[in-house]
Swiss-Prot record:
Compartment annotation: Cell projection, Cilium; Cytoplasm, Cytoskeleton, Microtubule organizing center, Centrosome, Centriole
Gene it is expressed from: TEDC2
Compositional bias segments (type: Low complexity): 106-124
InterPro entries: DUF4693
This protein's name: Tubulin epsilon and delta complex protein 2
A Pfam family matched in the record: DUF4693
Function: Acts as a positive regulator of ciliary hedgehog signaling. Required for centriole stability.
GO BP, one annotated term: positive regulation of smoothened signaling pathway
Length: 443
């Protein structure tokens, strides 16, 4: 049996391992849910059916829930129906009477036209002789004279002055009906007002006016094209500025996500600093060992030493910045900064040291990516097993060293320790205890 303190420590370590495994399993399940949600077939969300309003439900239920009509309502409905039928009959009678009057007026008008055509041309009763005028054929259209220029505000045909006096006594009703028919027709054919905006294209302007009009018409087009070019240039400049800003922000976000500061430490800069330091050291040694012959050489030597001192101060300042940068990177949880120079390029597909530059994960197929994920999980599991093995070694080896190597309990303890430490609990060793040779020999 293990001591109580040792058992508690081992149980605590095992519980921590189980908790970490459960947390890892939860993260994997969440990642799987997100991946399935992204890879499933996208379907547009169905539009929800409009919910019926309470008013419509009331209207639908009203006929079914309405009470039967009373006898008084039925009587009023019958009276209303009779009144409507009577109104329809009266309206039909009026329409028939109007059609008869219209037919009689048309017949009388045709008869008067025939008599006018058969009668010889007669002169007008007005003073002054006029040439006989013949009535134009029926298909010819007569221009209308505005009614405001004639007495009585009537619209008359041009050239019908000779026939104004005929049939005045006998055909007065027919003439009245004809006047009533002519007035609406003339009113509908009143000439439209002439506007320069609608019909100005029919005018023939002088040559100078036409040239000026065409030149003025081209100016707005040129101005609009210039404005379009200016707006396109401004839009292009704004798009370029927005793209540059977005690129800078993206690089800053990538550097922040990778855990690297903006002023990254590069191997080339370290090499340049080392070369500058070695050259400064050599030059300083040459100037100090030189023996000036006169005050001019001594003055030049002092100026050279002053310049070398300024360069050395700049190099020291840069080295201090790099040291601060290194300490800041080491304190971050992403991993320590490399202490030595950059190593050779690793065959991992990234093309550079994964510590000195961001490592790129390259894969050629989904199967290779799946294999990489499985190997990553396997490495995490092996790291956890190694940690548990170290804890078991720290707890069990002192117990083995304290007990004497005698008897079966010690052999069972060794077997259990070997199984837990060396085989990972997968296989148990079988220990055989042989009897001495003299006991097995016959007497």
């Amino acid at each position: 049996m293990l001591p109580a303190e040792c058992s508690r420590r081992l149980v605590a370590e095992l519980r921590d391992a189980l908790d970490s495994c459960a947390e890892r399993q939860r993260q994997l399940e969440q990642s799987l849910r997100v991946s399935r949600r992204l890879l499933r077939v996208w379907e547009p969300a169905e539009t929800p059916a409009p919910e019926p309003t309470p008013g419509s439900e009331i209207n639908k239920e009203a006929p079914s829930s309405a009470c039967p009509p009373s006898p008084q309502d039925l009587k009023e409905l019958e009276l209303l129906t009779q009144a409507l039928e009577k109104a329809v009959r009266v309206r039909k009678g009026l329409s028939k009477a109007g059609e008869g009057v219209k037919a009689r007026s048309l017949k009388s008008g045709s008869a008067s036209t025939a008599t006018k055509a058969s009668a010889p041309p007669s002169t007008s009763r007005c003073t002054g002789s006029r040439a006989p005028e013949t009535k134009p054929p029926r298909g010819v259209h007569h221009p209308w004279v505005p009614a405001k220029d004639l007495p009585g505000h009537r619209l008359l045909l041009v050239g019908d002055g000779a026939h104004m006096g005929q049939g005045a006594g006998a055909n007065k009703p027919e003439a009245g009906l004809r006047d009533q028919q002519i007035v609406p027709q003339a009113a509908s054919q009143v000439p439209e007002a002439f506007t320069l905006k609608d019909k100005g294209a029919l005018l023939r302007l002088p040559e100078a006016f036409r040239k000026a009009a065409s030149r003025n018409a081209r100016l707005p087009m040129c101005a609009s094209s210039l404005w379009a070019q200016l707006s396109s240039m401004q839009t292009r400049d704004s798009v370029d500025a927005a793209a540059a800003t977005a690129k800078t922000q993206f690089l800053q976000k990538m550097q922040t996500a990778a855990g690297l500061p903006s002023s990254m430490l590069s191997a080339a800069e370290v090499g340049r600093l080392q070369k500058a330091c070695s050259m400064l050291r050599l030059r300083m040694r040459e100037e100090l060992t030189a023996d000036p012959k006169d005050w001019t050489q001594e003055y030049r030597s002092l100026l050279t030493l002053e310049g070398l001192q300024a360069l050395a101060g700049q190099c020291l300042h840069r080295l201090q910045e790099l040291q601060e940068l290194r300490s800041a990177v080491v304190e971050q949880p992403q991993g320590p900064w490399p202490e030595g120079p950059p190593r050779a390029a690793l065959p991992c597909g990234g093309g550079a040291d994964p510590v000195w530059s961001p490592q790129l994960l390259l894969y050629s197929s989904t199967q290779e990516l799946q294999t990489l994920a499985a190997l990553r999980l396997r490495v995490a599991m092996l790291d956890q097993q190694v940690h548990l093995e170290k804890v078991l070694m720290a707890e069990l080896l002192p117990l083995l060293s304290e007990q004497e190597p005698l008897g079966r309990p010690w052999l069972a303890l060794c077997r259990a320790a070997h199984c837990l430490l060396c085989e990972g609990g997968q296989r148990f060793l079988t220990v055989l205890q042989d009897e001495p040779a003299d006991r097995l020999s016959p007497p």
